[in-house]
Amino acid sequence: MCGIIGIIGGEAAAPHLIDALKRLEYRGYDSAGVATLENGKLTRRRAEGKLKNLENRLAREPLAGRIGIGHTRWATHGRPSENNAHPHATEKVAVVHNGIIENFAELRRELEHRGVKFSTETDTEVIAHLVTEELKRGAPPVDAVKSTLPLLRGAFALAFLFAGEEIGRAHV
């Protein structure tokens, strides 16, 4: 089972995201990652294995954003790997997900038919691409999510981080 967390604060979010994810370690996981918003741009770090691997990566490549989302992954679609670790992102949105998107293969085929390129084996990546399509059509972030949710079948929890969003606005 996955763990998801979102933080909005007055200082760098990544250390707090790691602390929060440590509290979720008992749930089990095979990889972890965080994304933050820095100067309106999404940045993320991911690692396979234990949170210590992600902590080491963040020590080498810190994130300064004060708003962020984090995730510990227990693989349901796609093998454990850094590439399949959450958050999944496009240039416009990062998403973390707990649950299963039962119709992800169908959605993925539809997106690929429209020219969308996938970089993971996960069901979660379809969510990022569907929301991005809505954003490109001019939908505000909340409306992009509202338009995407009815397309998804399954049981799930989601947290999003949007590029260009001001500090203090997250959608969990």
Language-model segments: what does each one mean?
Residues 1-171:
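Conserved short alpha-helical segments that host acidic/polar catalytic motifs at enzyme active sites
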